[in-house]
A protein has these predicted regions:
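Active-site beta-loop-alpha substructure in enzyme catalytic cores
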Residues: 134-137, 141-156
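Soluble non-cytosolic domains of exported or imported proteins
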Residues: 2-5, 27, 141-149, 206
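Structured beta-strand-rich core segments of catalytic domains in phosphoester-bond hydrolases
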Residues: 3-9, 16, 22-118, 229-231
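Second-shell loop/turn segments in exported
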Residues: 1-2, 22-24, 138-144, 166-168
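Metal-dependent phosphoester-hydrolase catalytic domains
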Residues: 148-166, 171-250
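Stable alpha-helical elements in mature extracytoplasmic
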Residues: 7, 11, 32-35, 147-150, ...
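Generic structural signal for well-ordered alpha-helical scaffold segments
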Residues: 12, 90, 155-159
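A solvent-exposed, charged loop/short amphipathic helix patch at secondary-structure junctions
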Residues: 115-139
Length: 250
């Protein structure tokens, strides 16, 4: 989540060190004393678009895209959720326009039940363990269904896009899931599979076993470099990808 000053400073350094031109944030937060313009200035990226899905007295929460290049159009994919939504932005690079999709799909949110399970397990409360496991399974099933619906919404918009497409975000699901595969369709290349190395996990919880954050692109792009460094200030590793637009006029 992007809200604490130190994290914003760390992201600024990440942007500068990696010469990042387009930055997609899935858990954007604007505190009352630090708005989008201020954050934008700290990141050093002059263009931005933000959508909020939850507002409180002290902060607004949502999703955002920051860009070195002009953003000429943008829109929200509204999931009617206080925690999750997606968005797109048409970005002008030279004389070419690309569309970037930034996604934060339904949160699995089983950590609390997982903690309860460990508590019951530590005292050998078998009935408590069983109840908690049932709750976890039911919660997982419900969230799978929600993510499937969200993935269909995102894919429908991808299919109507006439520009070169980049899709990224926190899918809260694995490469084996319906959500991942439906969004990928038959025309998007997974950046990790194209240029990544090793196991490639992106979520640092659950013993670092899961890759749930992705970047993919259509045939208009060539993947050059993929990196997902471990950073101590987030439970997700950032996905950093260098791609080349084949049709660029620059």
């Amino acid at each position: 989540m992007i809200y604490r000053f130190k994290i914003k400073y760390n992201i600024k350094k990440l942007v500068e060190d990696n010469h990042i031109d387009i930055l997609c944030i899935q858990e954007h937060c604007e505190e009352s004393h630090l708005d989008s313009i201020t954050i934008q200035q700290k990141f050093g990226l002059p263009n931005r678009c933000v959508f909020f899905n939850r507002q409180t007295a002290w902060a607004n929460f949502g999703i955002s895209i920051y860009s070195h290049y002009p953003i000429i159009r943008y829109g929200e994919i509204n999931f009617n959720s206080e925690k999750n939504n997606s968005m797109w932005a048409d970005i002008l690079i030279g004389k070419d326009t690309i569309r970037v999709f930034n996604n934060h799909l339904q949160t699995t949110d089983v950590s609390m039940n997982g903690k309860k399970y460990e508590e019951y397990r530590s005292v050998k409360d078998w009935k408590g363990q069983a109840r908690t496991l049932v709750n976890i399974v039911e919660q997982l099933k419900a969230n799978f269904v929600i993510r499937a619906s969200q993935a269909i919404q995102v894919r429908n918009l991808i299919d109507t896009t006439r520009y070169p497409v980049i899709v990224c975000g926190d899918f809260n699901d694995t490469p084996m899931s319906f959500a991942y595969n439906h969004i990928a369709g038959n025309n998007l290349t997974d950046g990790f599979r194209d240029r990544g190395k090793g196991y490639g996990h992106s979520f640092n919880g659950i013993k670092g076993l899961l890759r749930i954050d992705f970047i993919s692109y259509d045939k208009s792009f060539t993947g050059l470099v993929y990196d997902s460094p471990h950073l101590p200030w987030s439970d997700h590793n950032p996905i950093i990808m260098k791609v080349k637009l084949k049709t660029t006029s620059r």
